[in-house]
């Protein structure tokens, strides 16, 4: 199947909400290019496909983990045993999905990235999927996933800070997700707040230079940064009822 046809099929699959197939079509495009880069549209389609496939399992894992805690507190050992087995199945799916995109990033997408925004886009993506592994892994595997996340985000940040404007939606999206990593995975609220606040303040200072084409994307992510800052600095945090915001849809980040 030709490149254009696979891209078209990926768009069809997205419309039909058949995201596993959308992933397959975009993987075919990604692996058939050699050293050639994906277009912005193609990389966004790939990102959206994987974000939906992983997002469904992350949501499932959170729900199951919450039920597991409740059953443990009630002492329902039989139920807990069933839940642990089911959670393990979801974790296996999560691992497979993350491994798939991480291999693609390392073997094809990152090596062929030639400009600042695509390098940051893919390194951020690499950080995101290592972070998703760190969400459910334990012990040495969690430590390794967290270290890989930090390494990818830092590499992305170094390029973003020199090659992308503070208002660039990809740079802002990186700051958003990097700060979530500090807060949720490394349990470092101070570092999370500092990173989010710095990104927000630097973008505000240059808001008048923002082009019309990315104004909506950039201001949306700035709002998410501010939402998280409000949540994290609040003295009246409840027990996790508020959802920490991260970039949900890379299709909105050109």
Swiss-Prot record:
| Coiled-coil annotated residue ranges, if any | none
- GO terms for cellular component: cytoplasm
Entries under SMART domains matching the protein: 14_3_3 (SM00101)
Q: Which Pfam families match?
A: 14-3-3 (PF00244)
* InterPro entries for the chain: 14-3-3 (IPR000308), 14-3-3_CS (IPR023409), 14-3-3_dom_sf (IPR036815), 14-3-3_domain (IPR023410)
Detail the disulphide connectivity of this chain as listed in its UniProt entry: none
Q: Which PROSITE patterns match?
A: 1433_1, 1433_2
Which superkingdom does the taxonomy of this entry point to?
A: Eukaryota
Q: Name one GO biological process term.
A: signal transduction
- Into which family does the record put it? Belongs to the 14-3-3 family.
**Subunit arrangement?**
Homodimer.
Q: Name the chain's protein.
A: 14-3-3 protein 2
Q: State the organism of origin.
A: Solanum lycopersicum (Tomato)
């Amino acid at each position: 199947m030709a490149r254009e046809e696979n891209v078209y099929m990926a768009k069809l699959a997205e419309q039909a909400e058949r995201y596993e197939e959308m992933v397959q079509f975009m993987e075919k495009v990604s692996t058939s290019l050699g050293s050639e880069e994906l277009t912005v549209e193609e990389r966004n389609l790939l990102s959206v496909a994987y974000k939906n496939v992983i997002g469904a399992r992350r949501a499932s894992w959170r729900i199951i983990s919450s039920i597991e805690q409740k059953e443990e507190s009630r002492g329902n050992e039989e139920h807990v045993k069933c839940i642990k087995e089911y959670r393990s199945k979801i974790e296996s799916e999560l691992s497979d999905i993350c491994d798939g995109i991480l291999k693609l990033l390392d073997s094809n997408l990152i090596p062929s990235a030639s400009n600042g925004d695509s390098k940051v886009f893919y390194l951020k993506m690499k950080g995101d999927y290592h972070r998703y592994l760190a969400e459910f892994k334990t012990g040495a595997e969690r430590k390794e996933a967290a270290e890989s996340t930090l390494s990818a985000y830092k590499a992305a940040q170094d390029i973003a800070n020199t090659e992308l404007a503070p208002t660039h939606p990809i740079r802002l999206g990186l700051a958003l997700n990097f700060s979530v990593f500090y807060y949720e995975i490394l349990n470092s609220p101070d570092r999370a707040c500092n990173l989010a606040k710095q990104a927000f303040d630097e973008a505000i200072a240059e808001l008048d230079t923002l082009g019309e084409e990315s104004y909506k994307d950039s201001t949306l992510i700035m709002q998410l940064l501010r939402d998280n800052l409000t949540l994290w600095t609040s003295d009246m945090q409840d027990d996790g009822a508020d959802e920490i915001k991260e970039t949900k849809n890379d299709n909105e980040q050109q």
